[in-house]
Curated annotation (Swiss-Prot):
This is Nucleotide-binding protein SPy_0652/M5005_Spy0539. Keywords: ATP-binding, GTP-binding, Nucleotide-binding. The keyword GTP-binding applies. ATP binds at G13, M14, S15, G16, A17, G18, K19, T20. One of its GO terms (molecular function) is GTP binding.
């Protein structure tokens, strides 16, 4: 597929079958997403995408919430199909009537087509109206027995563009315990047992990203042993986190102030993991002490 092409997925299907989970999954996969898109607006929106250098992977939810606008779906699909710069697929999410009724009862929401409040009547009418679209769909997923996690996994398997990096990202961050634990951390490691560069006058005002501080931290025997064990712990479990459907895993490494030891370790870990995974490196508190001094 040329870089000039737009990779479009139209997400549709029965109300209550999991389209919200689906569109969130596409967002995690790096798609530009819009929920509840009126069919008549789709061609114009795609024209705007063609005119930019922005993300050309697009997922749009088009369903019966559009009510009268949904009647234009066939002409919209014809317009898309006639455009050689657009590669598109339709993902149709379905579930049994009984399961859909159960989900509506659980959420206490009204069905968009149940004018008199009878959910089952709305479901039956919607199924009839969507039958032609379902027959056109390249991907039909029955979510009756799927958990949200399993649905995310199904979408990732079918629509991610290969590699670990398409659907799973690792956030490696450093922090200082004195400023509090990161609320979004999945794994937290404490390196306060290592010798502290803060007590070396020539290193005090630097951070773990400076070469002399980095070498000071990582050259200690304790650092070498701990880092080896850290890699041996983290690397084997990454595929399991990905398989479980997690899109972002945050690994946080902390020292006292978040300036020296944790920064060096986080940087080293991020570089090691980046050979096989999509990794983002950040250092929450590395400049916190300097900012405090400047304000005083």
């Amino acid at each position: 597929m040329s870089d000039k092409h737009i990779n479009l997925v139209i997400v549709t299907g029965m109300s209550g079958a999991g389209k919200t989970v689906a569109i969130q999954s596409f967002e995690d996969l790096g798609y530009f997403t819009i929920d509840n898109m009126p069919p008549a607006l789709v061609p114009k929106f795609l024209e705007l995408i063609e005119q930019t250098n922005e993300n050309r992977r697009v997922a749009l939810v088009v369903d019966m919430r559009s009510r009268l606008f949904f009647k234009e779906i066939n002409s919209t699909l014809d317009s898309i199909e006639s455009n050689p710069s657009i590669d598109f697929r339709i993902l149709f999410l379905d579930a049994t009537d009984g399961e859909l009724v159960s989900r509506y009862k659980e959420t206490r929401r009204s069905h968009p087509l149940a004018a008199d409040g009878r959910v089952l009547d709305g479901i039956r009418l919607e199924r009839e109206l969507l039958s032609p679209l379902k027959s056109m769909s390249q991907h039909v997923v029955d979510t009756t027995k799927l958990t949200p996690r399993q649905l995310r996994k199904t979408i990732s398997d079918q629509f991610s563009e290969g590699s670990n990096q398409a659907s799973f990202r690792i956030e490696v961050m450093s922090f200082g315990f004195k400023y509090g634990l990161p609320l979004d951390a999945d794994l937290v490691f404490d390196v306060r047992f290592l010798p502290n560069p803060y007590y070396q006058v020539e290193l005090r005002e630097k951070t773990g990203l400076d070469e002399d501080v980095f070498n000071y931290v990582m050259s200690h025997p304790e650092s070498e042993v701990f880092y080896k064990h850290l890699l041996n712990l983290i690397v084997p479990i990454l595929p399991a986190y990905q398989k479980e459907g997690k899109s972002v895993l945050t690994v946080a490494i902390g020292c006292t102030g978040g300036q020296h030891r944790s920064v060096a370790f986080a940087h080293c870990l991020a570089e090691s993991l980046a050979t096989d995974w999509s990794v983002n490196e950040s250092h929450r508190d590395q400049n916190r002490r300097k900012e405090t001094v400047n304000r005083s």
